[in-house]
Amino acid sequence: MTSSTESKHSNDESTDLEKQDAEESHGLPEERKQDIAAQLSSSDVQDPNLVDWDGPDDPANPMNWPKSKRLGHVVMASLTTLFANITSTAFAPAASSLEAEFGITSSITAALTVSIYLLGFAFGPLVIAPLSEHFGRLPVYRVCTVITVAFLIGCAQAKNLGMFLVFRLITGIAGSGPGTIGGGTIADVMAPENRGKAMGAFAMGPLMGPVLGPLMSGFIAQYLDWRWVFRVLCIATGVMTIVLYFVMTETYGPVLLKRKAARLRKETGNPDLHTKLEASGVSPLASLWMALQRPTKMLIFSPITLLLSLYCAFVFGLLILLFTTFSAVYRQQYGFNVSMGGLSYLGLGFGLAIGLVLFGMLSDKVAKKDSARSSEWKPEARLLLMVWFAPVIPGGFFWYGWTAYYKVHWILPMMGTSLIGMGALMVMMPIQVYLVDAFGPRVAASALAANTLLRSLAGCFLPLAGPSLYEALGLGWGNTLLGFIAIGFTCLPILFYRFGGKLRLRFPVTF
């Protein structure tokens, strides 16, 4: 009963897609046809029971959906990721009122109330990404957003510190879902040469979310209390969850093909019909176990994944360190109150916004131009922007540290953090797009999960060192130390730009 209903729905949907696509474009661009053809098996006449896409123009393939539908999924993936990342730091301006209510005196414990969310961001992807590659993207989006809403309510109603920390950790685990599989969703619906702008929109979540959070919650914390921060987040995330349920559909190709094979087996009565994945002879349980291991294995056996994820983690950890110390720095150095403290994030936010615009304008153009010299698409071309902008980060730290130390007008430290924000985006975004392009839709979510694991661990634990670092070395030398470490990382994009192709061949992801 269910299968026949699904069959009828699928046939109707395919007919609609064919009509819309024909009206929209009268044929696919040749570049997209070539990319889709790469997903198809070579006409395997030796296996007439193999179920695959019906050629490169198959309207059921998410790559061939109408542009509006594909962009709709990019927007939803980006917005759900943005909301999850707003939640990561929105609580920061209100942390002092929670500390007073629960009698927190340790600076490390105080920082943990904000950063423990990112501990959930670290470990959630290790399970969430493999589940999306086994069961599909859509169930993961739905389950994660519902759990997030439920535990945001828990945070708002917490009666003691232990309860709050547990609820916030679980919120972080569930909140990591959209960011973990969003890159996979984009890989499902966008051709490699057109992913730059889509990934730029997606980057608003991990990079702009932590900036927008304190800006939005600063006045709530000033005039209400910390519990209302979580209530507002719960309402906003709940609305987004309802929209997601009505707008998003499944995009993961292997899952769609498995459904197609099941439908055809029922319609034709041929039990031998199968997909390439089903033909591998691997049981569903074994396939799930392999998928669960994949992110960890990529960190161990792929130097590309490990080293670039370490760089991304360091940069992200620096951003969260700044987020958790801005309020104290601007209060002590410039006398900002709680509501004004949210304004201290503007410089970093402005820099991230500038970086986002630059990345959207330049990424695809630079990558296509660089690849054209070798007459083939080269994922390493994505790293060229990173080579150019990586030195901006240490420069920003030197500027911010010493202007804040000498209490120069508050606009100047913000200008320094603008440089940090722009440089951070132009480092982190090329890494994420490169991982998607280098490993392809099949394991893109696992590659990003491995990246998210290290990034979130750094985001959780590096900020804990911030107060002690500034207390021991001061704002000037403390930020100078961070800048010098950042200089050491600038050689990585150059090395991977030149030798990344050879490393991909030397260490292929076959697991």
UniProtKB/Swiss-Prot annotation:
- The keyword Ribonucleoprotein is assigned to this record: no
Subcellular locations according to the entry: Membrane
Q: What is its main location?
A: membrane
Q: Name one Pfam family in it.
A: MFS_1
Keyword Transmembrane listed: yes
Report how it sits in the membrane: Multi-pass membrane protein
Q: Which InterPro entries match?
A: MFS (IPR011701), MFS_dom (IPR020846), MFS_trans_sf (IPR036259)
Task: List all Basic and acidic residues biased stretches.
Answer: 1-35
In terms of superkingdom, the source organism counts as: Eukaryota
Residues annotated as transmembrane:
74-94, 108-128, 147-167, 169-189, 201-221, 228-248, 303-323, 342-362, 383-403, 411-431, 443-465, 476-496
Q: Which PROSITE patterns match?
A: MFS (PS50850)
Positions annotated with a glycan in the UniProt record: 337
Which UniProt key words apply to this protein? Glycoprotein, Membrane, Transmembrane, Transmembrane helix, Transport
Q: Which family does it belong to?
A: Belongs to the major facilitator superfamily.
Function, as annotated? MFS-type transporper; part of the gene cluster that mediates the biosynthesis of macrophasetins, 3-decalinoyltetramic acids (DTAs) which feature a tetramate (pyrrolidine-2,4-dione) unit connected to a decalin fragment and that have potent bioactivities. Efflux pump that might be required for efficient secretion of macrophasetins.
Official protein name in the record: MFS-type transporper mpsC
Q: Which gene is transcribed and translated to give this protein?
A: mpsC
